[in-house]
Amino acid sequence: MDYKTLVPVMRRLALEAGAKIMEIYEADDFDVQVKSDNSPVTAADEAADALISAGLRAAFPDMALVTEEQADTHGTGAMTFLIVDPLDGTKEFIHRRGDFTVNIALVEDGVPTRGVVYAPAKGRMFFTQADGQTVEEAGPFEMGTTGTVTPLKVKAPDNSALMVVASKSHRDQATDDYINKYNVKDMASAGSSLKFCLVATGEADIYPRVGRTMEWDTAAGHAVLKGAGGDVVRFDDHSPLTYGKDGFANPFFIAYAPGVELKPA
């Protein structure tokens, strides 16, 4: 894959999808449907998915594509593929909380290597450059031109005073029980892939996820964190979280800055 070609395409499509999502977000009302797995879906999910998938297929016709909203893409069997969640954090979108993102990533041999996470309501854009370094771009954003970027690097954690970020919509007792194993200075809650990005920027040290996620929920954020020097491991045995799994369901996981002394499950 030519990363110098890929990254600008992913960034542009994320911006275009974000603009479409915000049109619907700022409308007086929008319909919410329920999918077969009981998760919500809106016109914004579908419009963003159509835009991104068409753009990726046009630019990279020979690359396998997996996208949340198209079930016929879920049987690819490939270990190298593009993966999309056109609107991650649909519940945040529905409740107009702003913590939703557009996620686009490249997975190579089971590892997310390049990704973009764009939070249009927050005006925050994170992506991995062609060289693999993660940056945050300052707005306002232009489709064809990348603005000022700041390279990101996870911070060195203080295990006696950790900053923890957890899910805004999916927090439960199991998550709290695990967090309580650490010496926590402060807690933050965030929706969607923004949790990975907060670890990447140094705003948090660790993000444990003790709950259901799919690969399209995590691949872009995983790539962003990886490009900032962070890591994502399985909750049960702390082995690397891999992609291309049958059904695309993730095990529980921990995203963290190296130096955090991980506790057993």
Map each language-model feature to its residues.
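Thr-Gly-centered strand-to-loop micro-motif
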Residues: 67, 166, 209-210
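Oxyanion/phosphate-interacting regions
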Residues: 1-12, 18, 177-181, 196-265
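Acidic beta-strand-loop-alpha-helix segment within the catalytic core
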Residues: 105-196, 244-265
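Glycine-rich active-site/cofactor-binding loop and its immediate structural neighborhood
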Residues: 78-117
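N-terminal subdomain of lithium-sensitive/metallo-dependent phosphomonoesterases centered on the IMPase/IPPase/PAP
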Residues: 1-87, 173, 177-181, 197, ...
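Residue-level signal for inorganic ion chemistry
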Residues: 21, 45, 56, 90, ...
